[in-house]
Amino acid sequence: MRFSFLSGIRDLFRHFIISAASGALSDRLGWVWGAIAKVFSGSVWLRYKIAKPPHQVQATVVSVGNIVVGGTGKTPLVLWLAQALNERGISCAVLSRGYKGKCSQRKSFTIVDPALHTAACVGDEPLLLAKHLPAGTVRIQKDRKALAEKSAGAFDVLLLDDGFQCNRLHKDVEIVLVNGSDPFGGRAFFPKGRLRDFPERLAKANYVIVNGKCSPSDQRELDLLNPAAKILVEPQISEIVWLNKSANMPRDHWEGLGVGVFCGLGFPKGFLTMLRNAGIHVLGTHLLPDHSGITKQELELFCKKIILRQGVGILCTEKDSVKIEAFAEEMSLPIGEVRMRFSCVCNEERMVAMLDAIEAIQKNKKVTT
């Protein structure tokens, strides 16, 4: 009960600060953000100091996380990992808190079913993952330790979504993503910067995946923190699916496409850069706080604005599209869901080695249990 209550208060406070820090008050209250950042960093330090030994479960636990508030590409990586391990005959469950989903408040876990659940119920990211993964494999509950205990007997591998700060559960493999353009979250704790953890903790990761181009100085610093585990990837568009046309857009039509873009991401700059790198002309944006949804009225107003700028459609991420399915077909412009994939810039063999290592740990754990 105490765990659930404190988590609820923390999430409510975090959502308020994110909304305020991204709005007009941000510049005026810099000193307030600095003071709160000191309190936040102190609470993070204390949490690690008083942490009890982590609980071990029967299955292999692979954590995918980050050290900043949102926006590093965890969800596409979790999806890729689950699919890659499934191809090797390894059964996987994705364990998520179901952030901002009403079902996450329940004492028992919820198996995410796209045919039954909405993003408001289970959270946008779990719903997105459940659409692409085998039925019954995406599960949400705030208490991931309890969720892991209930799921361990049914799966070979448990993928812990956003698990780097989860101290209550033993993790066999730690994968941490960082944004190449800002790997250290502005070098300040949230809300003054975007850090939610100490950069020094990257040394504890088995693999650090750098999403996007990184400056030479940041690369050197990452190498000092964790020299052996770095993997460089670039986000790329795999396809664009028009929700209200039920059709894919051919790749050769992307160049010069004039569109509006809306998204609720922790780091929208990365998404916009990827679109521009593909030759897409962004005529206007409607940016929302991470995990926030756009209303039907807001989206239609944005469509009309883009029509005046001679735009031919509106693009959003998969995470955003799951929140507008009920009214996407009613909009005055086509709505395009941008699907992404990671492309290895270098060290591709490390991605394969990472999968090999997870498989080896899983097989060894299976023999010893």
Curated annotation (Swiss-Prot):
The entry lists its GO molecular-function terms as: ATP binding; tetraacyldisaccharide 4'-kinase activity
Can you list the disulfide-bonded cysteine pairs?
none
**Its annotated pathway?**
Glycolipid biosynthesis; lipid IV(A) biosynthesis; lipid IV(A) from (3R)-3-hydroxytetradecanoyl-[acyl-carrier-protein] and UDP-N-acetyl-alpha-D-glucosamine: step 6/6
Record key words, sorted: ATP-binding, Kinase, Lipid A biosynthesis, Lipid biosynthesis, Lipid metabolism, Nucleotide-binding, Transferase
What is the species listed in this Swiss-Prot or TrEMBL entry? Answer: Chlamydia muridarum (strain MoPn / Nigg)
Q: Which family does it belong to?
A: Belongs to the LpxK family.
Q: What gene is this protein a product of? A: lpxK
Highest classification ranks of the organism: Bacteria, Pseudomonadati, Chlamydiota, Chlamydiia, Chlamydiales
Q: Which named protein is this?
A: Tetraacyldisaccharide 4'-kinase
What InterPro entries does its record include?
Answer: LpxK, P-loop_NTPase
**One GO CC term of this entry?**
plasma membrane
The kind of enzyme this is, by top-level EC class, is: transferase
